Swiss-Prot record:
The gene is groEL. One of its GO terms (cellular component) is cytoplasm. This is Chaperonin GroEL. It is an enzyme of class 5 (isomerase). Forms a cylinder of 14 subunits composed of two heptameric rings stacked back-to-back. Interacts with the co-chaperonin GroES.
Length: 547
């Protein structure tokens, strides 16, 4: 296919155009008075959302080069989402501000590599400053505040997440599912999560989120490799008759068997997913036995004289719901409390008896997984459109609270970054020179961008607000919900330090990449050839036939 090649300024300008378009559509959602964005869906009702990364994923431009700019800045949002689960809009706005200022300097003759070096050093300095200023989270109230802000200032959601964390512990699993009523409810049930995702992405049932969700599935647990699909046939046939989904957790599934499962899944013959068993050696077996207890099934192992080809449907475990993504599997079970408690007691006894610290640690891990349970938040809403929006907000809120527990909190509302700008300028003037200093100053100017945007979305003058905040103490900032200057920590307007840090690092990384771009190679759009006119029957046959 023919390519189009663009160099220098023209290349960077084309990228900038795409970045502008994406940032504008995402930035309108920033802050407590941010607006919503409506996404058209090919099938079903349009989606009304307020989530930066979801909007970014939807944007595709006609112009290939501008689309490359969109993809670059989308990466800043996705990487922040992967690392911290929230703060995607802030990362996008920051990256945009850095790119704009950087391109002006490159156009004026500055060396892009030196600018990038300055930007990178500024990012390292700021990360250390954010860590310095982060306050650890100690009480439930702070957790509720972080959750409420991430869910779009919804105090009820914040409180619910704080309750969930209290019940299942800071490391516990909080799962989301669609409720049957108008209200959002919380329940704690038996369950566990382990760090293995699906073996093949073709098992995903929700391709937008790349997740496999199995409702009331059967679970086949085995500690051996599944090599031949013939071994599985009796079980698969029995399950196909019940019409229920199946999850296979095995040491491994080899190519032939995996291909057969995928084909059956894609053809709709059987809703099946497969996951590798977690752990190694004896620990793997013990964890599989834990899962067997949790799901009221049997571990099919040759030690017990059981073979997969002879497995009956009664030997399989069951669960209420299983969610699998590329990295983790969450099992929500119910109705097995007695067996789970007995198993936990058994693990505690083993912990008392063992001398090895390593074994104790691993047993403690297993106990936490089994005893902690899963907090299930059932999302309630009046319409499906509202349900989807609520689910995205809740997901952000859960991720943000976990990030806050990990690395602490900082003043929110763009305040932290704005307050760090003078410190960065001072440090850069002392430690950097020439074009590296210009690079660091680009970052210092960009740090005001999220605060300005939050203020503008609330109808205030962004530049005036940023200037006012700069002269106030570190924890004071602009409360866009009430249009006044307050102590952000006292008012509960807080951000997880991890979210602020990830957003900044990813924005600086993308900005550096865009500034050092000197050439773009993209596909030339294919010219659609005009169809020949099929006039009359002249010259024999009509022009509409393909001979």
């Amino acid at each position: 296919m023919a390519k189009r090649i663009i160099y220098n300024e023209q290349a960077r300008r084309a990228l900038e155009k795409g970045i502008d378009i994406l940032t504008e559509s995402v930035a309108v959602t920033l802050g407590p008075k941010g607006r919503n964005v409506v996404l058209e869906k090919k099938f079903g009702a349009p989606q009304i959302i307020n989530d930066g990364v979801t909007i970014a994923k939807e944007i595709e431009l006609e112009d290939h080069i501008e689309n490359t700019g969109v993809s670059l800045i989308r990466q800043a949002a996705s990487k922040t989402n992967d690392a911290a689960g929230d703060g995607t809009t802030t990362a996008t706005v920051l990256a945009h501000a850095m790119v704009k200022a950087g391109l002006r300097n490159v156009a004026a003759g500055a060396n892009a590599i030196s600018l990038k070096r300055g930007i990178d050093q500024a990012a390292v300095f700021l990360v250390s400053k954010i860590e310095e200023n982060a306050k650890p989270i100690t009480d439930n109230n702070s957790i509720a505040q972080v959750g409420a802000i991430s869910a779009g200032n919804d105090d009820e959601v914040g409180k619910m997440i704080a309750d969930a964390m209290e019940k299942v512990g800071k490391e516990g699993v909080i799962s989301l599912e669609e409720g049957k009523s108008m209200t959002t409810e919380l329940e704690v049930t038996e369950g566990m999560r382990f760090d293995k995702g699906y073996i093949s992405p073709y098992f995903a049932t929700d391709t937008d989120r790349m997740e496999a969700v199995l409702e009331e599935p059967y679970i086949l647990l085995t500690d051996k490799k599944i090599g031949l699909v013939q071994d599985l046939v009796p079980v698969l046939e029995a399950i196909a008759r019940t019409g229920k989904p199946l999850l296979i957790i095995a040491e491994d599934i080899e190519k032939e068997a995996l291909a057969t499962l995928v084909v059956n899944r894609l053809r709709g013959v059987l809703n099946v997913a497969a996951v590798k068993a977690p752990g190694f050696g004896d620990r793997r077996k013990a964890m599989l036995e834990d899962m067997a207890v949790l799901t009221a099934g049997q571990l099919i192992t040759e030690d017990a004289g059981l073979k997969i080809e002879n497995a009956k449907i009664e030997m399989l475990g069951t669960a209420r719901r299983i969610t699998i993504n590329k990295d983790t599997t969450t099992i929500v079970a119910e109705g097995n409390e007695v067996a789970v408690k007995a198993r936990c007691e058994q693990i505690r006894k083993q912990m008392d008896e063992t001398e090895s610290t390593y074994d104790k640690e691993k047993l403690q891990e297993r106990l936490a997984k089994l005893a902690g349970g899963v907090a299930v938040v059932k999302v309630g809403a009046a319409t499906e459109t509202e349900m989807k929006d609520k689910k995205l907000r809740l997901e952000d809120a859960i991720n943000a609270t976990k990030a806050a527990v990990e690395e602490g909190i900082v003043p929110g509302g763009g305040t932290t970054l704005a307050h760090l700008a003078p410190a960065l300028t001072e440090w850069a003037n002392q430690n950097l020179s020439g074009e590296e200093l210009i690079g660091a100053n680009i970052v210092a100017q960009a740090l005001d961008a999220p605060l300005k945007r939050i203020a503008e979305n609330a109808g205030a003058n962004g530049s005036v607000v940023a200037e006012n905040v700069r002269h106030k103490p570190f924890s004071e900032g602009f409360n866009a919900a009430s249009n006044e200057y307050v102590d952000m920590l006292a008012a509960g307007i807080i951000d997880p330090a991890k979210v602020t840090r990830s957003g900044l690092q990813n924005a600086a990384s993308i900005a550096g990449m865009v500034l050092t771009t000197e050439c773009i190679v993209v596909d030339l759009p294919e010219k659609k050839e005009a169809a020949p006119a099929g006039g009359g029957m002249g010259g024999g046959m009509g022009g509409d036939f393909d001979y």
